[in-house]
Amino acid sequence: VIGGDECNINEHRSLVAIFDS
């Protein structure tokens, strides 16, 4: 689960960066 969460966090951060731009 932790590994999956890490992947999810990476994807979430990418989305946040896009929205932040």
Curated annotation (Swiss-Prot):
Free-text tissue specificity from the UniProt record: Expressed by the venom gland.
Molecular-function GO term, any one: serine-type endopeptidase activity
Keyword line: Disulfide bond, Fibrinogenolytic toxin, Hemostasis impairing toxin, Hydrolase, Protease, Secreted, Serine protease, Toxin
Activity regulation, per record: Inhibited by PMSF, bovine aprotinin (APR), and soybean trypsin inhibitor (STI). Is not inhibited by EDTA, beta-mercaptoethanol, and high temperature (85 degrees Celsius).
One term under GO cellular component: extracellular space
Its job: Snake venom serine protease that completely cleaves fibrinogen Aalpha chain (FGA), partially cleaves Bbeta chain (FGB) and has no activity on gamma chain. Is more potent that A2 and A3 alpha-fibrinogenases. Very active within 5 minutes.
Known partners and oligomeric status: Monomer.
Record-given protein name: Alpha-fibrinogenase A1
Species per Swiss-Prot/TrEMBL record: Crotalus atrox (Western diamondback rattlesnake)
